[in-house]
């Protein structure tokens, strides 16, 4: 006997575990950070920008990217433990020759956060010296409680050159639609029934309507334009309303927008006065053919200079076992301060 997994389990592990939009974006940015990206970008392309027929959302990084083997052995494997073994990377091609980073993700399911952004989705990813990989999927397929994971086909193809991307994209859509060829299970029961028939029709129609419009292709080409290009890009064809509202100036929605932006501000540590390891960006390309930055143009949420206005400052360092050594400043008085962790000292607890 063996366990069998319903497709719904992936939906519950992914979108079901994401509280809000900032969490979804942050989880994907964490994966970009772990992939040694320098730049983590998000961009909303509004309907009407350069004659776009629809709105799109793109989330990208310039990390090490993935080969087809990486996708099959890691990205499509849930709960991978490579980040939770407490093993530091070695400076090499795997780190893009950068200083090893402490991993931000650890559960192996952060990639499923992309389901929260909208549907359907096209993932493009490339490692240095490897061909571009394209994966197409609509996460709503996982909402069918009659499907098992091994019933589902997730199409993946290599892109020999950017000129063939549209052709490959059409092949991916065709392969994805084969998920609906089978109408009955082994017990001769309908796979799609009741209210889910409406969901099925919506998924099929959204896939048939999905296009790579000129402005979107230009953005993709700017990222993957050479053999040595590297990184990962998620293109969402029907972004959720929360994403679309990022471009709104309606006073009634300003609180929701401010919550999203303030949450994303916290992804980087602006209390450090030296150069950041990474840069984050959230741009809007609106229907007036204008583009503007939401995160960096809004002013720093906090910065290192704000320390000067604090009444209490704790300044020091933690070692890999959770012990702290430094000093505590209360108004003008500075005292030495240390803390010894009671955590057991083993390699799984070392950071």
Predicted regions mapped to residue ranges:
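Compositionally biased, intrinsically disordered low-complexity regions
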Residues: 16, 196, 233, 268-270, ...
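Generic detection of intrinsically disordered/low-complexity segments and helix-coil linkers/edges
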Residues: 23, 69, 133, 174, ...
């Amino acid at each position: 006997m063996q366990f069998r997994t319903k497709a719904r389990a992936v939906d519950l592990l992914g979108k079901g575990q994401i509280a809000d939009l900032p969490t979804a974006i942050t989880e994907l940015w964490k994966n970009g950070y772990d992939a040694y990206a320098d730049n983590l970008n998000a961009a909303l392309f509004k309907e009407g920008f350069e004659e776009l027929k629809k709105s799109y959302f793109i989330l990208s990084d310039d990390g090490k990217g993935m080969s087809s083997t990486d996708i099959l052995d890691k990205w499509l494997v849930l709960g991978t433990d490579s980040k939770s073994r407490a093993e530091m990377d070695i400076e090499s091609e795997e780190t893009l020759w950068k200083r090893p980073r402490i991993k931000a993700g650890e559960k192996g399911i952060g990639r499923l956060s992309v389901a929260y952004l909208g549907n359907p989705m096209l993932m493009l990813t490339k490692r240095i010296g490897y061909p571009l990989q394209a994966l197409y999927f609509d996460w709503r397929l996982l909402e069918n409680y009659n499907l098992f994971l091994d019933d589902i086909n997730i199409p993946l193809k290599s892109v020999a050159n950017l000129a063939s991307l549209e052709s490959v994209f059409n092949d991916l859509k065709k392969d994805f639609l084969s998920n609906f060829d089978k109408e009955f299970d082994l017990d001769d029961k309908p796979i799609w029934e009741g209210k889910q028939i409406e969901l099925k029709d919506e998924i099929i129609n959204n896939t048939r309507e999905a296009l790579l419009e000129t402005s979107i292709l230009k953005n993709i080409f700017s990222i993957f334009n050479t053999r040595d290009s590297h990184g990962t890009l998620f293109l969402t064809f029907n972004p959720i309303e929360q994403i679309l509202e990022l471009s709104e100036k309606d006073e009634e929605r300003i609180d929701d927008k401010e919550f999203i932006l303030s949450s994303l501000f916290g992804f980087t540590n602006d209390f450090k006065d030296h150069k950041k390891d990474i840069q984050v960006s959230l741009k809007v390309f609106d229907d007036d053919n204008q583009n503007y930055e939401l995160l960096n143009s809004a002013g720093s949420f906090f910065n290192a200079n704000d320390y000067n206005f604090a009444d209490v400052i704790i300044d020091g360092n933690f070692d890999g076992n959770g012990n702290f050594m430094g000093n505590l400043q209360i108004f003008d008085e500075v005292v030495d301060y240390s803390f010894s962790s009671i955590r057991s000292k083993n390699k799984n607890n070392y950071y």
